[in-house]
């Protein structure tokens, strides 16, 4: 019995793995950017940092996955956008520290290697990289029968970016009186899906709920996470932003305080938060307490900026989209986030 046949009998299809590599090459090529060295398939991805033109470069990295949103992608057999979610979760974190994304690596683990499906996943990763300006310089696809079911897969990503040392955003510049500006989310993004799946466990996904403005439930639930790089990067370059919070797991309550010192707090005007219909539906059908919604979800604001009052107009000029003045930074009395 040949080694190939022995491996195949154990559930690993080497030929399918080779096919995946061939299928994804055209998608990876879309992400090419200055600084990339070498070709896909090497033992390590290479990047020439000198090509960035940054004088005092500081590398900033992030890693994340998409949680149980993957289970809905599998349930609805829609795999072409979940990769964008993975990229977004990573690059939105590092842009919050002031980094321009340079490159990205992905990791896909599955119970059965299905080349057509995995191509869709990686195509989504590539689309996310294009939106973020990051090169997809490497990755790993692992077929692990026995670890995962045949239809199951998991996805994780790793982003590396660069910032000028003087432009790092670490919360030290946020001060009392700063204005809090919110940038709209595209939907739930990629957190809170264990609760989302429980709320809609008995739904097929084809439903058009009255709150969802004519959209099918499954399309709203799988709406890809917005990538904020192109919106935020010009603001960082002009040093117009004192703090940035990526609103992910933990909602407003956990994420907003991550962008300022312990003696400060955020005062949020709830009436100015552009709450999306899906959050109203979740609160209603899930019988979730209103205040708890802000502890779990982004509620319609995926990125929050702390900006000096004198810079607010310039920030709005640079952002080609609605910008929501949702609050301000105050001295902390008790809670780190006060929603009024």
From Swiss-Prot:
Its EC number is 6.3.3.1. Pfam families: AIRS (PF00586), AIRS_C (PF02769). GO terms for cellular component: cytosol. It catalyses: 2-formamido-N(1)-(5-O-phospho-beta-D-ribosyl)acetamidine + ATP = 5-amino-1-(5-phospho-beta-D-ribosyl)imidazole + ADP + phosphate + H(+). The keyword Nucleotide-binding applies. It is an enzyme of class 6 (ligase). Keywords: ATP-binding, Cytoplasm, Ligase, Nucleotide-binding, Purine biosynthesis. It is found in: Cytoplasm. GO terms for molecular function: ATP binding; phosphoribosylamine-glycine ligase activity; phosphoribosylformylglycinamidine cyclo-ligase activity. One of its GO terms (biological process) is 'de novo' IMP biosynthetic process. Coiled coil: none annotated. Pathway: Purine metabolism; IMP biosynthesis via de novo pathway; 5-amino-1-(5-phospho-D-ribosyl)imidazole from N(2)-formyl-N(1)-(5-phospho-D-ribosyl)glycinamide: step 2/2. Its main location: cytoplasm. Belongs to the AIR synthase family. This is Phosphoribosylformylglycinamidine cyclo-ligase. The lineage of its organism: Bacteria, Bacillati, Bacillota, Bacilli, Lactobacillales. The gene is purM.
């Amino acid at each position: 019995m040949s080694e190939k046949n022995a491996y195949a009998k154990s559930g690993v299809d080497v030929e399918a793995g080779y096919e995946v590599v061939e299928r994804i090459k055209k998608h990876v090529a879309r992400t090419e950017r200055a600084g990339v060295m070498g070709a896909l398939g090497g033992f390590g991805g290479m990047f020439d940092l000198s090509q960035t033109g940054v004088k005092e470069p500081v590398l900033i990295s992030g890693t994340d996955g998409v949680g149980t949103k993957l289970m809905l992608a599998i349930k609805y057999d829609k795999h072409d956008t979940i990769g964008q979610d993975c990229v977004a979760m990573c690059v939105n974190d590092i842009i919050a520290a002031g980094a321009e994304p340079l490159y990205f690596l992905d990791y896909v683990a599955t119970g059965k290697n299905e080349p057509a499906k995995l191509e869709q996943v990686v195509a989504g990763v590539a689309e996310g990289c294009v939106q973020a300006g990051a090169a997809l310089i490497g990755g790993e696809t692992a077929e692990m029968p026995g670890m995962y079911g045949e239809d199951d897969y998991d996805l994780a990503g790793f982003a590396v970016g660069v910032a000028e040392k003087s432009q790092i955003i670490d919360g030290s510049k946020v001060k009392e009186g700063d204005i809090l500006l919110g940038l709209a989310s595209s939907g739930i993004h990629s957190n809170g899906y264990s609760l989302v799946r429980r709320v809609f466990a008995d739904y097929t996904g084809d439903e058009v709920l009255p709150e969802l403005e004519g959209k099918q439930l499954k399309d709203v639930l799988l709406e890809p996470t917005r990538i904020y790089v192109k919106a935020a990067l010009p603001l960082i370059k002009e040093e117009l932003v004192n703090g940035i919070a990526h609103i992910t797991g933990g909602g407003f309550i956990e994420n907003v305080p991550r962008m300022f010192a312990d003696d400060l707090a955020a005062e949020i005007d709830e009436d100015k938060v552009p709450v999306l219909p899906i959050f109203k539906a979740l609160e209603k059908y899930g019988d979730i307490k209103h205040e708890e919604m802000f502890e779990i979800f982004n509620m319609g604001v995926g990125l929050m900026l702390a900006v000096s009052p004198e810079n607010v107009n310039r920030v709005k000029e640079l952002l080609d989209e609605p910008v929501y003045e949702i609050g301000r930074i105050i001295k902390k009395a008790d809670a780190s986030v006060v929603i009024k």
